[in-house]
Amino acid sequence: DGKFTVSNTATYRFGLFQEGKLPSQIVTRSYIYQDKDYTLPIISVVTDPINLYDDSLGVYVKGVNGRTGNGQSTPCNWNMDWDRPVNFEYITPEGGMVVNQEVDFAMCGGWSRAFTPHSFKLKAGKIYEGLNSIEYPFFADKPYLKHKTLQIRNGGNDTGCRIKDAAL
């Protein structure tokens, strides 16, 4: 009957395959198990783990194929201008999935590239489903509906802050 039960947070990728036929488009869905109330949107980024964590190809690790720079004296993969294919979902606090599309994932930032979690950007491109923008009003006070790139930042420029700094 094709039904299944989700009892914890999980991401699934579905596709249809039949010998002698072209495969279907892959469909990705993240299921957030509502064991608590969420007050912020949820960003789901799904890809083959090799794209992020492989020492040779991964953009999210120090790795072995990188370059120096951005405060690093040893080569780091996260310094490379590499794009990796990912599926991006934006889920509202109410549980509504308002964006679900394939995009490119790339590292961003300067010195903050070395700090985890790393900052990254999601870039729309016609190569994926013919969509060259991400369409959603992410910022209620801005008139923008279409975005070519979204940056997810780690607050790296604030890593040196201390409670005392704010109190002075």
What is the meaning of each model-derived region?
Residues D1-L168:
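Phosphate-handling architecture centered on phosphoinositide signaling
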